[in-house]
Regions:
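Repeated loop/turn-to-beta-strand initiation elements of outer-membrane beta-barrel proteins
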Residues: 51, 90-93, 143, 194-197
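Flexible, solvent-exposed loop segments that connect beta-strands
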Residues: 55-70, 103-126, 159-175, 211-223
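Short glycine/proline- and aromatic-enriched beta-strand/turn motifs that initiate or cap beta-hairpins
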Residues: 22-75, 237
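Residues that define the transmembrane beta-barrel architecture of outer-membrane proteins
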Residues: 37-41, 73-77, 125-131, 145, ...
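Residues on the lipid-exposed face of transmembrane beta-strands in outer-membrane beta-barrel proteins
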Residues: 43-47, 79-85, 97-99, 131-137, ...
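Bacterial Sec-dependent N-terminal signal peptides
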Residues: 1-28, 234-237
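A glycine-rich, hydrophobic loop/mini-helix early in the fold
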Residues: 80, 85-120
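Predominantly the C-terminal beta-signal and adjacent terminal strand-loop region
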Residues: 27-28, 177-182, 187-237
Length: 237
């Protein structure tokens, strides 16, 4: 919750700053009729950082073999197609199907001797097909830029999930293929001579429990496993 409050404060400051500077400096507008289009398209490229929220089972502390359990994020990249429907002067509906490549690690600390632990790190690769819908709320346009906030939900399908794969004796952490996430973000639209360029950052929180329990120590120790992360994207429309 504290992180969300920080983002909201930053968004408000950006919008206030854009209003003040926009009123002082007026320049010839690029693409003056751009925002009157009912429908337009584009593409997006970016980087991401995926991680897990790990909720341990209630009997985790009673386990005298597994002593530590935590997740670690890694950087990935994403690319997608932008479809934007104008709803009003300040609001748009956006559909941005994307292909997201990322990976995460879950680290298990097992008791090795009385005074030391042995780390077992499980690497989890994900190739996600995202289907997000956003409502975008824009500030007034000033010169050749405007700020915006957006929020929505997305369905993700992990084509790299090992949920239905026979591990043949190998102990792997299996995740379910389907996920549902909430997302919020903000960005700035820059109107260039021939197109609009938009840097944007979003944070997401998974709603579903992804752990696929196969009665191994690696999954039995986890009660709930959900996704969280952020994306920094650059959109060309």
């Amino acid at each position: 919750m504290k992180k969300i409050n920080k983002y909201l404060i930053l968004i408000i400051l950006i919008i206030i700053t854009s209003n003040v500077f926009g009123q002082k400096f007026k320049k010839p507008q690029n693409l003056p009729r751009y925002d009157f289009q009912k429908l337009h398209f584009g593409f997006t490229l970016g980087i991401n950082s995926l991680n897990f929220n790990v909720k341990k089972n209630s009997d985790f502390l009673a386990n005298d073999t597994l002593l530590q359990l935590y997740s670690r994020s890694q950087k990935g990249f994403n690319l997608g197609i932008v479809s934007n429907l104008r709803l009003g002067k300040y609001t748009d509906l956006r559909f941005v199907p994307a292909l997201v490549f990322g990976e995460r690690y879950i680290s298990y600390g097992f008791l090795d001797t009385i005074s030391s632990t042995n780390q077992s790190i499980k690497r989890i690769e994900s190739t996600l097909i995202d289907f997000p819908f956003y409502i975008k709320y824009k500030s007034e346009r000033y010169n050749n830029f405007r700020t915006y906030v957006l929020g929505g939900f997305k369905y993700s399908y992990d084509i790299a999930s090992k949920d239905e794969i026979d591990d043949e004796g190998k102990q792997i952490v299996k995740l379910k293929k389907h996920d549902l996430m909430g997302e919020i973000g903000f960005g700035i639209d820059f109107y260039l001579e021939f197109f609009k360029f938009s840097p944007q950052i979003k944070i997401n929180y998974g709603i579903l429990n992804l752990i696929s329990n196969d009665n191994t120590l690696y999954t039995n120790s986890i009660n709930r496993l959900s996704t969280n992360g952020w994306m920094l994207s650059f959109t060309f429309e």
